[in-house]
């Protein structure tokens, strides 16, 4: 049994110096916790959740300083993101869960599944968590410039919850940290250590912040991951790009969730 009967709930979950806005659909189905993109919100998952339907227990939340309600923090590190998963699960009384992460959330999901093999039913990683050395000095500078260029309009959108309440430097630092976590010597051993059913859903082409075939080169790194670990497979490669995959190819993500649950 992975979930006891619960009623739908929406509220704030305290963790460290902050609190996270969370929604739990309740029910007795398999718990699925959804891990957002780096600066995205829980609303991105609505189509996947609709595809799966009410037979699952869907748990979504907004990370620190994301969305309209999650509070700011002194710590926006990757390890803080891992702690937040545990805080959400503890607050909702969930022991075992299936993790589904997109982009940055895929990295969180991979790390959490690797560290918690007895608690992870499985993982679905959507166009993220691919070991590749894409960060160098030139890329780091490109990241900082990109967030500086975006800084002028960010305050205008923050009241809508569409952009995070991190400043340009904080966003760049978070993205650069992700580049370091992505390195083959860092992420490769994490992927090799996963012992639960794990499925990738991959996007195609380029999206915001990438050039040429950069993202396809990164995706190609998964061939080695799949060859080394029999628990990991590619469920689908879809036509949509990284930014639109949850909107245009949500059905493929839902299918991967069912695939993992059926293993």
Predicted region positions:
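Active-site loop/oxyanion-hole signature of alpha/beta-hydrolase fold enzymes
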Residues: 46, 50, 59-100
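Conserved hydrolase catalytic core segment
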Residues: 95-134
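Conserved loop-alpha-helix segment in the C-terminal half of the alpha/beta-hydrolase fold
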Residues: 207-240, 247-249, 254
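Active-site nucleophile elbow and catalytic-triad environment of alpha/beta-hydrolase enzymes
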Residues: 173-190, 220
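N-terminal cap/lid segment of alpha/beta-hydrolase-fold proteins
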Residues: 2-19
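Conserved HGGG/HGGXW glycine-rich cap/lid loop of the alpha/beta-hydrolase fold
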Residues: 18-68
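A catalytic-pocket lid/entrance helix-loop region that shapes and gates access to the active site
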Residues: 129-130, 134-158
